[in-house]
UniProtKB/Swiss-Prot annotation:
One Pfam entry name: Formyl_trans_C
This protein's name: Methionyl-tRNA formyltransferase
Organism of origin: Photobacterium profundum (strain SS9)
Cleaved signal peptide residues: none
Record-level GO cellular component terms: cytosol
Protein family: Belongs to the Fmt family.
Keywords, sorted A to Z: Protein biosynthesis, Transferase
PANTHER family to which the protein is assigned, alphabetical: METHIONYL-TRNA FORMYLTRANSFERASE, METHIONYL-TRNA FORMYLTRANSFERASE, MITOCHONDRIAL
C-alpha cells in the first residue's frame, strides 16, 4: 500500500502545468512549487507568470522562483521544506548535486522521449524529424548527467503520419501525468524498479534553431515533409521567394519530380504548389506570407501568383 508523499514540484510551461494539476488531484501532498522567474511576454513585454505559477497560486501553494539553484540561500530554502521527493517537469534550470540529494527520495524527471533515445532539449521535434514511429515519456531518477538517470517508468504512443510537434506535445502532456502518478505509487510502496540506460543507444535532441528551419529542396520530399511537421509550431519551416520568407504549415509528398532540379515549381493551382525535391516532390497546401495569417495555396496564388510561375526556382 502506498502512502502519500510530500512533493516539491519544479516546472514552467503548460506541459509541466498539466503534470502539476494531476498531482493536485492525487493522494500526494504538493508542499511547494518551483518555477522560472516571470518573463516579459506579448507586444507590451509585460512581466508574465508561467502556467505552473498560475496553477500554484490558484491552489494557494508557496511559489519559489530563484534565478539559480546554485545559490546557497536557495538551497537552504529547499532543504527547509523537508520534501520526500522533488518532481521535475520542463523546469529549465540545472539542478546541482546538492539539490538532487536534498529530498529524502531524490528527484525524478518526466522526459518527452523513450530514453535513452533523444536525451536533451527538443526530443519531440527531433523524433518527428527523424521519422520515428513511436515516442513517449520516460520518468527517471535524476543524476548529474543530461537525462542519463535510471529509468523508472516508460509510457509509449505511436507518432502518426500527420502529427506535428504541437499535436505530439498535447498527446504527451496527456500521457505523462498518468505515468507520473503510477510511478509515484510504486516509489511510495517501495516497488519501483530502476533500469539503467544503455549509453550506446543514446542520442541527443539538440535545441532547434531558425537556420535549420530553412527548407533545403535538395533533401528528399519525405524528409522535408517531416521537417515541416517537426518545426510546427516553432520555428516553422520556410522558403524564400521574391526576397520574402514564406512559412509552410502543411505539405504532402508527391512521388514524381518530373526530372526537374530541386526547388523547381512544377505546378501551382487550387490543389497546392508543387515543388521538385532531391527525391520526389512536395505539394505545399498551407502557407503563411510575411505579416499574414496562414492560408491555403489558392489564396496566396490569388494575390501573389507571380511568385509561383511554373519553372521558377525557389
Amino acid at each position: 500500500m502506498s502512502k502519500p508523499l510530500r512533493i516539491v514540484f519544479a516546472g514552467t510551461p503548460d506541459f509541466a502545468a498539466r503534470h502539476l494539476a494531476a498531482l493536485l488531484s492525487s493522494q500526494h501532498e504538493v508542499i511547494a512549487v518551483y518555477t522560472q522567474p516571470d518573463r516579459p511576454a506579448g507586444r507590451g513585454k509585460k512581466l508574465t507568470a508561467s502556467p505552473v505559477k498560475n496553477i500554484a497560486l490558484e491552489n494557494d501553494l508557496p511559489v519559489y522562483q530563484p534565478a539559480s539553484l546554485r545559490n546557497e540561500d536557495a538551497q537552504q530554502e529547499l532543504a527547509a521544506l523537508k520534501a520526500d521527493i522533488m518532481v521535475v517537469v520542463a523546469y529549465g534550470l540545472l539542478l546541482p548535486k546538492f539539490v538532487l540529494d536534498t529530498p529524502k527520495l531524490g528527484c525524478i524527471n518526466v522526459h518527452g522521449s523513450i530514453l535513452p533515445r533523444w536525451r536533451g532539449a527538443a526530443p519531440i521535434q527531433r523524433s518527428i524529424w527523424a521519422g520515428d514511429e513511436e515516442t513517449g515519456v520516460t520518468i527517471m531518477q535524476m543524476d548529474e548527467g543530461l537525462d542519463t538517470g535510471d529509468m523508472l517508468t516508460i509510457a509509449t504512443l505511436p507518432i502518426e503520419p500527420t502529427d506535428t510537434s504541437a499535436t505530439m506535445y498535447d498527446k504527451l502532456a496527456g500521457l505523462g501525468p498518468n505515468a507520473l502518478i503510477d510511478c509515484l505509487s510504486e516509489i511510495s510502496a517501495g516497488t519501483a524498479i530502476a533500469e539503467k540506460q544503455n549509453d550506446e543507444l543514446a542520442n541527443y535532441a539538440k535545441k532547434l534553431n531558425k537556420e535549420e528551419a530553412k527548407i533545403d529542396w535538395a533533401m528528399e520530399a519525405t524528409a522535408i515533409e517531416r521537417c515541416i511537421r517537426a518545426f510546427n509550431p516553432w520555428p516553422m519551416s520556410y522558403f524564400a521567394v521574391a526576397e520574402q520568407n514564406v512559412k509552410v504549415w502543411h505539405a504532402v509528398v508527391e512521388a514524381e519530380n518530373q526530372g526537374k532540379a530541386p526547388g523547381t515549381i512544377l505546378s501551382a493551382d487550387k490543389q497546392g504548389i508543387t515543388v521538385a525535391t532531391g527525391k520526389g516532390a512536395l505539394r505545399l497546401i498551407e502557407l503563411q506570407p510575411p505579416g499574414k495569417k496562414a492560408m491555403k495555396a489558392q489564396d496566396i496564388l490569388n494575390s501573389r501568383r507571380e511568385w509561383f510561375e511554373l519553372g521558377t526556382q525557389l
